[in-house]
Amino acid sequence: MTTTDDPRADPCFEEAEDAILEGDRTFTPGTAAAALSHRTFRTVYVGAFVSNIGTWMQNVVLGALAYDLTGSGVFVGVIMFAQLGPLLLLSMVGGMLADSLDRKKLLIALTVEQALCSVLLALVVLGDDPSKVLLVAVTLAVGIGNALYAPTFSAVLPMLVPRIDMPGAISLNSVQMNASRVVGPVIGSFVFARFGASWVFLGNALSYAAIISVLLTVRLPRPPTTGTQGLHRLLEGVRYARNDPIVWRCLVVIFTFSLFCLPFVTQLPKIAGDSLGIAPKSTGYGVLYAMFGLGAVVGALSIGTVFSSASKPRLTRYGLVAFAVFLTVFGALRLSLPAYPVIFCVGAVYFAVITSLTTVLQRDLDDAVRGKVMALWIMGFGGTVPFGGLGGGVLMERFGITPVLLVSAVVAVGLSFYARLDRPAGAAAPTAALAD
């Protein structure tokens, strides 16, 4: 194995360590506050948050628009498949690019591509009867850009802080992702209901300027390299994961959880309309989605604050059981009012699980393969969701909403028994050499 210099020796990383080098750090290592003390991380974090608000404006309106146009849960699943399906097919390519190309230039190029596609979406839906084929095609183009962008960004963010502060950085990244799920749907549903979907998509295109401007002004750490090429490089992440039982279990859990437990996310417009009496093209639907996002913010933030010193493997197992309980309750509801607090609880335990699981996965990863392993994570976290959503839509049409969500809950309980993620005392994580 050959490597370049450790990225933490890079000048931009020295800048990120100001709080430590000046000797006046008062934050507990590993907490969210400690992660925010690093300037480069803080700058990228804010830019990503603003951009993700626009992304979630678009995400929630795409699903609502699909249901509004057709009244079909299957077409909602098709749109979500176009949006998220590329994560399963292209994330490994994105991870390989993240570990071999200039990450800053790559992120900027992919952000510009997604912004242009959002403008195209706005043009496609201008008329009263937009082409469903074009809607799916342009949504697919957005999904392809995101599939290449996501593993790169996921690999960059933890490298902007020392390893000791990585849990806080991961927790904060989950917070900004889900805080944008609160703000974005509220703004998006309001604009959709009053001005139409085109203005939502244009707003998202403008929001990309926030992350582009940040990326133009900061320096990012250079990744090490393992020196491998071609298909061998593409499969490095898989080989590394197979040699680390903890990483492998994390990936099995996220793939299974996303495929079988998250159809409710993509089918939320159908659940809201059919079970709860909440029209997808309404502010009430935006508030429902925002409550889910707000719960996710609380759950993610709790991992870097209240539960910062708690065992993340144990939190993962307990969280899976709690998720099953709240999802079962949500699936049984037929009134809109109690749905808001219940989906808040679903969101809280959902992202407490995701954040704990991500922390376990990332804490011992070799930086030389971080992008490729995180590509596998993105494949599981986002790439399997559209398959579950599409299948969930078909099953909900045939058997109803409650039975499908009950099956999801049973799978979550089963995963709680499988998710034994504690590394044996004294056992070291594999190095990138084992991926060769």
Q: What function would you assign to each model-found segment?
A:
Residues 2-436:
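Alpha-helical transmembrane-bundle signature of multi-pass membrane transport and export proteins
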